Design a protein with these regions (language model features):
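Repeated loop/turn-to-beta-strand initiation elements of outer-membrane beta-barrel proteins
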Residues: 205, 230-232, 259-265, 288-293, ...
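C-terminal transmembrane beta-barrel domains of outer membrane proteins
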Residues: 403-573
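Structural signature of outer-membrane beta-barrel domains
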Residues: 214, 239-241, 272-274, 298-302, ...
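Transmembrane beta-barrel outer-membrane domains
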Residues: 200, 215, 242-246, 271-277, ...
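Transmembrane beta-strand segments that form the barrel wall of outer-membrane beta-barrel proteins
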Residues: 230-240, 251-255, 261-272, 280, ...
Length: 573
């Protein structure tokens, strides 16, 4: 690989030295073309956007399909006409009798009574309380069953840490928020605290209830264990740009919980034939409520090959990021988190040894994201993220006079949405639908534009095909689990993709096909085993490409099937 320029642009407050005619020619070369025109050379913003898409992890398989846990009935039968409840104070008894109605007036086995006890516990849980139910020794031949309900009341909180790296006192304050001695366990608060503690990198927390010192109370004892100090992954794929190298290798390393307070230091490296990317990040809990702060920095350097090699086109992009995140809802069935992030980008491009363009962008992004697990009809899972972005783009004053991209100079705003739903159709079949899109209120910098092509979009087209300010992609996949032997899983799927793009929100000049769509269909295979994931997919274009030239794609490749592969190995238990 050729050495990449570390500082291709060094603005010194001067006007650029090229004559006016040369500037006009360069401006025409880098302007976004109308559909059917040759593609311009990619710039730092496009390369940055492509790198961020390549770094995004593929969506995981959905949670396992729901199965019934009730064992088959066995042993003697008896008929129950009435349930006598003892120890019930937090709920009206009528609520529990209504929940037990399916078990009255019919022959039951002992296993059926155990299912009835679970229904009582579920009723408490649905109202936000923790309880246990059991059957005291009794004679049930008369048709009356006595159920003893032990309503959980908090006694005290203990920690078993045994000289661990994790700070037990900090974790105890996180789990114990909202718990008061002698009062009933508020199940949502208890569940939230335990889940937040287990969200901390490099920390495992298990809560056990034990009989308390005071009658009717239960003590919560936390078993705190350390996870591995180091984690990470390596990956190889072909989702790079044709001009910087399709093959890319990615390495990630994390240092988990080095301080004992649930922090994480991360580093990411990506290498392509003509691309180098490096990033670092740090996250830290701010108190025990779940609030987290994050800092990040990335640096990217590129050089264009293929037909742009003679231009000696190269550039760099640097990104600073700071954010605050807070879990609005944390539970085993649904989660919602909010994040506010500030981002600053500096993007530089050069050609033929001359500084070409310098752009600076700053924005604030408010993100809401979450997921939910659904019951019924085999079960399902939904995950979503919504971003609302407001920012400002600045170009060097000398460039504004000639650059058609100057239309992106100034303030911008946009909204992004990603929605994914998985639904089990049977023990081995599930359907996945994914909608991804954005809407801008004006023209955007290339680093912020939406793209249809690539393995995360319309999979029958190459990376960076059909970029624009606003757009959307819908992916539909039908999956079949072919085998789950040992600890591995083989998953085959058919897919169909369709996307629409608006190249410029506020077009200038002649753009006959500012709006158009692309479609593709294909098949794929995924293999998971012990942290190793292999993805292979083939996408075939369906219909024509209004944005292409003479039947080819915008990057000059012929229209035909696209083969995508990605191999990833995680180094964490």
């Amino acid at each position: 690989m050729r050495a990449l320029a570390r500082h291709p642009i060094r603005p010194q407050g001067r006007r650029f030295a090229l004559p006016r005619a040369a500037w006009l020619a360069l401006a025409a070369a880098v302007a976004l073309p109308a559909a059917g025109a040759p593609a311009p050379p990619p710039d730092a913003g496009q390369v940055q956007r492509q790198a961020e898409r390549a770094l995004a992890a593929p969506p995981p398989p959905p949670p396992a399909a729901a199965t019934s846990a009730d064992p088959a009935g066995a042993g003697p039968q008896f008929e129950v006409h009435h349930f006598r409840l003892e120890g019930v104070t937090l709920l009206p008894e009528d609520t529990l009798h209504e929940a037990l109605a399916p078990w009255r007036g019919r022959p039951l086995h002992f296993a059926d009574l155990q299912a009835a006890l679970r229904r009582i516990v579920a009723a408490y849980r649905a109202h936000g309380w923790f309880a246990r139910a059991d059957l005291p020794e009794q004679d049930i031949t008369e048709g009356t069953v006595t159920v003893r309900v032990l309503e959980g009341r908090f006694g005290r909180l203990g920690v078993l840490e045994d000289d661990r790296r994790a700070r037990g006192d900090f974790i105890a304050r996180m789990v114990g928020r909202g718990l008061r001695a002698g009062e009933p366990y508020p199940l949502p608060r208890l569940e939230r605290g335990l889940l937040l503690a287990n969200d901390l990198p490099g920390v495992y927390v298990d809560g056990v209830l034990r009989p308390g010192e005071q009658p009717g109370t239960s003590d919560l004892v936390l078993q705190v264990d350390d996870g591995p100090l180091f984690g990470g992954s390596i990956a190889v794929g072909n989702d790079g740009s044709r001009y910087t190298g399709r093959a890319q290798a990615i390495a990630r390393l994390t240092l988990d919980n080095p301080s004992g307070y649930g922090d994480q230091l991360g580093a990411t490296l990506m290498r392509g034939e003509e691309l180098e990317y490096a990033g670092t990040s740090y996250t830290l809990p701010l108190g025990t409520s779940g609030l987290r702060g994050s800092l990040g920095y990335t640096s990217l350097h590129y050089r264009l090959g293929k037909e742009f090699e003679e231009l000696d086109a190269r550039g760099a992009s640097r990104l600073h990021r700071a954010g605050l995140g807070y879990p609005l809802l944390r539970s085993g069935s649904a989660n919602v988190e909010m994040e506010l992030a500030w981002t600053r980008r500096r993007q530089e491009d050069a050609s033929l040894g001359e500084d070409l363009r310098l752009r600076r962008l700053q924005d604030l992004t408010l993100s809401l994201f979450g997921d939910a697990v659904h019951g019924g009809h085999g079960g399902g899972h939904t995950a979503w993220i919504a971003d609302f972005v407001r920012g400002r783009a600045r170009l060097e004053e000398a460039w504004l006079e000639f650059d058609p991209a100057a239309a992106v100079h100034g303030r911008y705003s946009m909204a992004r949405l990603e929605l994914r739903h998985d639904r089990w159709l049977g023990p081995d079949w599930y359907l996945r639908a994914r909608l991804n899109g954005q809407r801008a209120n004006g023209n955007l910098d290339s680093s912020l534009q939406f793209v249809l092509g690539g393995p995360a979009g319309v999979r029958g087209y190459p990376v960076n095909e059909a970029a624009g300010d606003s757009g959307a992609v819908l992916q539909l996949e039908l999956h079949r689990l072919l085998g789950t032997g040992g600890d591995g899983e083989l998953d085959a799927y058919l897919f169909a993709d369709h996307g629409i793009i608006r190249q410029r929100q506020d077009p200038w000049g002649y753009m006959p096909d500012n709006h158009y769509g692309l479609s593709a269909a294909g098949l794929g295979l995924r293999w998971n085993r012990r942290g190793f994931t292999a993805n292979l997919a083939v996408g075939v274009p369906v219909g024509n490409n209004p944005g292409g030239l003479d039947g080819d794609n915008q990057d000059g490749t012929g229209r035909g099937p696209q083969l995508w592969f990605n191999l990833r190995q995680r180094f964490r238990p």
